[in-house]
Regions:
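Catalytic or ion-translocation cores adjacent to nucleophile or general acid/base/metal-coordination motifs
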Residues: 2-38
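Acidic, glycine-enriched catalytic cores built around paired aspartates
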Residues: 29-212
Length: 212
């Protein structure tokens, strides 16, 4: 395998423009296609499961972790300059080594979470095929990357254009980023305030198959 993981932030994510561009593409794709993602994980059994029984909620949001959320905030403010790094976890047991704590942490209440160097889509039921989800995920991200390519290929100053594109994209789509408790009633109210869809069943999701 000689490929490059485009979602690997590296040691200094704030300096990794390639990673930030692909991160922005995923954020935009998820925000613009949340209803289709919800549809891809929908059947009567899974509709009942979502939001309970250790399953993520039906509202689509992205968990980035403290490090990447801080970087997104810096980008939006226009002062990107640093990356938060993981702290050490001291168990208090002297015979055990001090453990490195992941800077992205974990949030099991998130339906779409960044975990180190990849995203996890966690809504799909165990009995469901991953084919539909993969088709939707790959298509929606490819569509956004195609839009990015069209814009960047005609840029006179590529570096300036890509930085501006990243800032514009995450600013417009940061509403879908949520690092808190996806099970809470407060999140349902906050998601509605942000304009995020709350598609509660397969029947409600069907009309989105024919929307633009």
């Amino acid at each position: 395998d000689t490929g490059i993981n485009l979602l690997d932030p590296g040691k200094k994510p704030h300096e990794n423009t390639k990673f930030l561009l692909f991160l922005a593409a995923v954020i935009k794709a998820v925000d613009e296609n949340a209803e289709l993602l919800r549809l891809s994980a929908s059947n009567p059994g899974n509709d009942h499961r979502l939001g309970a029984n250790e399953a993520p909620p039906a509202i689509i949001s992205i968990f980035l972790g403290e490090q990447l959320e801080d970087i997104i905030e810096q980008i939006v403010r226009g002062d990107l300059s640093s990356s938060i790094h993981g702290t050490k976890l001291d168990t208090g047991v002297h015979v055990l080594p001090v453990l490195r704590k992941d800077a992205t942490d974990r949030n099991r209440t998130s339906p779409f979470a960044f975990t180190g160097n990849k995203f996890e889509f966690r809504m799909l039921g165990s009995s469901m095929s991953i084919a539909g989800v993969n088709f939707i995920l790959n298509t929606m991200v490819a569509d956004v990357l195609n839009q990015f390519a069209d814009e960047l290929e005609k840029a006179d100053d590529f570096d300036a254009a890509v930085n501006e594109l990243i800032k514009k994209t995450v600013t417009e789509h940061q509403r879908v980023i949520f690092n808190g408790d996806g099970y809470s009633d407060e999140w349902v109210a906050e998601a509605e305030k942000r304009g995020l869809p709350n598609v509660k069943s397969f029947v409600e999701a069907i009309p989105y198959l024919v929307t633009d």
